[in-house]
Amino acid sequence: MSLSLWQQCLARLQDELPATEFSMWIRPLQAELSDNTLALYAPNRFVLDWVRDKYLNNINGLLNAFCGADAPQLRFEVGTKPVTQTLKTPVHNVVAPTQTTTAQPQRVAPAARSGWDNVPAPAEPTYRSNVNVKHTFDNFVEGKSNQLARAAARQVADNPGGAYNPLFLYGGTGLGKTHLLHAVGNGIMARKPNAKVVYMHSERFVQDMVKALQNNAIEEFKRYYRSVDALLIDDIQFFANKERSQEEFFHTFNALLEGNQQIILTSDRYPKEINGVEDRLKSRFGWGLTVAIEPPELETRVAILMKKADENDIRLPGEVAFFIAKRLRSNVRELEGALNRVIANANFTGRAITIDFVREALRDLLALQEKLVTIDNIQKTVAEYYKIKIADLLSKRRSRSVARPRQMAMALAKELTNHSLPEIGDAFGGRDHTTVLHACRKIEQLREESHDIKEDFSNLIRTLSS
């Protein structure tokens, strides 16, 4: 047996797992085979525990399939694989911790370091961190919709400049991207209080560059941004059509990456879908790890409301949280705004927070939601999105070009309306409720497996909720 055994396992796991999961958890592992033991080295304890918990059976199954009774024992360790003189296979043939995507010909990947090795000597500028100390990992409510994004952000905070550089988070407004940026900043500074961590909106970068040009201070501008330890930029899509800003950020990006300085970017859309941004920048955005944050599912919305109420020392009955979460689905910001209004009304009136009270306090907001999202509206939006007719959604046609949009529309109706499964089935040509249930489960499965389906679902949710 040789290291090619692990390479065979990698090839199979890459086929079996969603691309994001493989890049985040499997690719950073290093392997060493010795004395019939396959040692897998994880970059930190978090990755080790996650892989052992989630993928141990997958890996053991592959080892047994490839080797039968001679399958090696599996051992997990934190750290990097020791290099010995007897190792015949070059180190670069083993998946390195910093390799998170297919290698780019124009970039030489930096060696894996902590992110703080060879930090430049203290520079003249006074760094404006702008990191909000209130946004931490502890008060970020985790759910299925944001689990991968939070895990990736946590690893970056623990190992800046390491495996996931750059980290690119994308999703609709109010889903927690900014919270995670601040949480990473707080995490880095908790470990290294003197770290130069800068958070900013992309428009601030543009404003600073314009000011530097006006004051003939472009060199100071470059020195400021290229000597930070971590640069966290929100809403990168606002660089669109700003050619000089893109040019300067391109060189800043390259300088930071070469110095193992961490970059985290957020956007409201997938990198390649950002219009008005140069292809060379969009390509670099995808060099590290790209993770989507989707609208929170019902259970997460309830958890967000309960946590927010607890932070305000307010007792929120579970049935009230469920009532609000069931009706307000688009994003976290909307949920928190609604709860703030309920709390304010309760404080002003001295009344208990009940479902009837919430109906009254949020009357206009709930009416607007019910008016905006109807099954008819969903059918119209889905038909336009997939360029088919509404009649096709209601028909008995079973071709994939029609069946998949129909399943998508049914899943959206279940997610965005209060209609029962039989009612949804009736609205789609008199179909049985079991057909609707199958459609919902199918779309949920495809969202895990297919980037295109995940994007379609998120885009349609955003359109219908806006």
Curated annotation (Swiss-Prot):
Record bears the keyword DNA-binding: yes
Main location: cytoplasm
Segments of this protein annotated with the region Domain II: 86-129
Domain I, interacts with DnaA modulators as annotated region, ranges: 1-86
PROSITE patterns listed in its UniProt record: DNAA
GO cellular component, one term: cytoplasm
Region (Domain III, AAA+ region): 130-346
GO biological process: DNA replication initiation; regulation of DNA replication
Claim: Amino-acid biosynthesis is one of the keywords in the record: no
Binding site for ATP: G174, G176, K177, T178
Residue segments, region Domain IV, binds dsDNA: 347-466
InterPro entries documented for this protein: AAA+_ATPase (IPR003593), Chromosome_initiator_DnaA (IPR001957), Chromosome_initiator_DnaA-like (IPR020591), Chromosome_initiator_DnaA_CS (IPR018312), DnaA_C (IPR013159), DnaA_dom (IPR013317), DnaA_N_dom (IPR024633), DnaA_N_sf (IPR038454)
Compartment(s) where it occurs, according to its Swiss-Prot or TrEMBL record: Cytoplasm
Entry keywords, A to Z: ATP-binding, Cytoplasm, DNA replication, DNA-binding, Lipid-binding, Nucleotide-binding
Single GO molecular function: ATP hydrolysis activity
HAMAP family in UniProt: DnaA_bact
Function statement: Plays an essential role in the initiation and regulation of chromosomal replication. ATP-DnaA binds to the origin of replication (oriC) to initiate formation of the DNA replication initiation complex once per cell cycle. Binds the DnaA box (a 9 base pair repeat at the origin) and separates the double-stranded (ds)DNA. Forms a right-handed helical filament on oriC DNA; dsDNA binds to the exterior of the filament while single-stranded (ss)DNA is stabiized in the filament's interior.
Assembly and interaction partners: Oligomerizes as a right-handed, spiral filament on DNA at oriC.
Homology family: Belongs to the DnaA family.
Domain description: Domain I is involved in oligomerization and binding regulators, domain II is flexibile and of varying length in different bacteria, domain III forms the AAA+ region, while domain IV binds dsDNA.
Protein name: Chromosomal replication initiator protein DnaA
Species per Swiss-Prot/TrEMBL record: Salmonella dublin (strain CT_02021853)
